[in-house]
Amino acid sequence: MAKLQLGYKASAEQFGPRELVEIAVAAEAAGMDSVAVSDHFQPWRVNGGHAPFSLAWMAAVGERTERVKIGTSVMTPTFRYNPAVIAQAFASMACMYPDRIFLGVGSGEALNEYATGFQGEWPEFKERFARLRESVRLMRELWSGEISNFDGDYYHTKDAVLFDIPERPVPVYIAAGGPVVAKYAGRAGDGMICTSGKGMDLYTEKLIPAAKEGAELGGRDFDALDKMIEIKISYDPDPELALENTRFWAPLSLTAEQKHSVNSSAEMERLADELPIEQVAKRWIVASDPDEAVAAVKQYTDAGLNHLVFHAPGHDQRRFLDNFQRDLEPRLRALG
């Protein structure tokens, strides 16, 4: 099994760019192995929402830190972005911060794409997944340093060359919510990304077996695949605060269909705020006892997930990081 790693989710929907950089620096000081940032053009909330540009943030964090891996969780390199330009951006960052940059990719949400000019009906999963696969092929072709004349169904290059490429290609992590994409992650990804709180059967019966099948079909070492999961955790010694902190992230409790098709932050916020706090909290590990919190996390390592990226919902992230370093990190390291 791949090495146990502990990471921090930098919530770009909740914090402005400067504050989020400083929090990432604090996360490294608290012992985190990685920091992963979301990439939204529009946040899920109008009130209190933010949407700093992930690539600018990553470069700033690279300059301010020394060892943490830095990446997206996740970016959609298929609609508002040209994948060739994303390949250039990540190649440049990987040159500046060797072996510290990774690219996490997903198939996209309408919220970010309509705001930046997408027109027509939001594509079905089949097209979005096809675009994603094609974009990954194109980016890897460019990272080879060879001349690219890519002629795909969606993307094209003509005599394109990246003149600054890292010694080793940028690792690509594939976000998987179901077995179809998990199989692709196993076959073609350097890592797989999923999120917690969706019932253990999803991980043990669908995602992990599908990723393993994909790796076997591709003749790859499944154990070498970095299996990342965003752990939604609201840990605080104050149980009332641990529960109430989840409120800001009520949009996570909407269905995938709602999140993928809603095209305005105001509508997303309206739908989310109609949910009772008990339903909102179901997506989270809500705990004030460290042993209870770690026992809940252990389910995921037992399932075979090795890279745990912790997403804390509260507005006081330094409080969470202090609590994490004191109460949770020693117990979590013992799992590996």
Curated annotation (Swiss-Prot):
Quote the InterPro entries the UniProt record gives: F420-dep_G6P_DH (IPR019944), F420-G6PD/mer (IPR050564), F420_G6P_DH-rel (IPR019945), Luciferase-like_dom (IPR011251), Luciferase-like_sf (IPR036661)
Task: State whether keyword Chaperone applies.
Answer: no
Annotated catalytic residues: H40 (proton donor), E109 (proton acceptor)
Does the keyword section mention Nucleotide-binding? no
Q: What class of enzyme is it?
A: oxidoreductase
Per UniProt, the keywords (alphabetical) are: Carbohydrate metabolism, Oxidoreductase
Sites binding substrate sit at T195, K198, K259, R283
GO terms of molecular function: coenzyme F420 binding; glucose-6-phosphate dehydrogenase (coenzyme F420) activity; oxidoreductase activity, acting on paired donors, with incorporation or reduction of molecular oxygen
The UniProt record lists the EC number as 1.1.98.2
GO annotations under biological process?
Answer: carbohydrate metabolic process
Which residues does the record give as coenzyme F420-(gamma-Glu)n binding sites?
D39, T76, S107, G108, N112, G177, G178, V180, V181
Reaction(s) catalysed (UniProt annotation): oxidized coenzyme F420-(gamma-L-Glu)(n) + D-glucose 6-phosphate + H(+) = 6-phospho-D-glucono-1,5-lactone + reduced coenzyme F420-(gamma-L-Glu)(n)
State whether it acts alone or in a complex, and with which partners, per the record: Homodimer.
Any idea what job this protein has?
A: Catalyzes the coenzyme F420-dependent oxidation of glucose 6-phosphate (G6P) to 6-phosphogluconolactone.
What family is this?
A: Belongs to the F420-dependent glucose-6-phosphate dehydrogenase family.
**Record's protein name:** F420-dependent glucose-6-phosphate dehydrogenase
To which species is this protein native? Tsukamurella paurometabola (strain ATCC 8368 / DSM 20162 / CCUG 35730 / CIP 100753 / JCM 10117 / KCTC 9821 / NBRC 16120 / NCIMB 702349 / NCTC 13040)
Q: What is the lineage of its organism?
A: Bacteria, Bacillati, Actinomycetota, Actinomycetes, Mycobacteriales
